[in-house]
């Protein structure tokens, strides 16, 4: 599971991370990680393999890696000072008609330490979002996806407005763990096929037609750590998520 190179020079490496690849090595992680690949295949021996920021295991897309300690310090400082610009594409439940901003501090869920929630005593978190396209699963397509459902079950889906979705462009202004996922759940528009935050029943329905969480790191902008030049790099939506959009109609 080797990531594609989007850009590289003597100071940095920008990769297109495939879904399913864990970023950081840890005792609890048994599979090969991006950190392992960077140290072995790219001979990057600095801390964390030079990884500047994280992406969740099932999130695909653009990730920034430093090749030197000095470049790592510079890029991490840009994240801390909010110079870096990031954009994600997320397919969410429900119809979102207007752009908005979610400002909600995020902390660990006291009832489940593996999850995060909006908490007054959490760390500051801000996410901007804007609708790209409103989409739906029509009656015929719902029948194709759920052929084993009877009329009562199908009516229940329609009553719950299950077939309504929006493709969002999300711009996190801070970098909290699970930030986009938590914020979209908080405004009642959870990401499609998000096992942690969509809810068990919804997740099971989503998995019938969406193979993984629909969250893709599409774009990143930053100052080059050596030249100071502003750079913007992009990752195309992967084939598995393109197929998901083809299932839906606008």
Feature map (PLM): residue ranges:
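RNA pseudouridine synthases
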Residues: 1-250
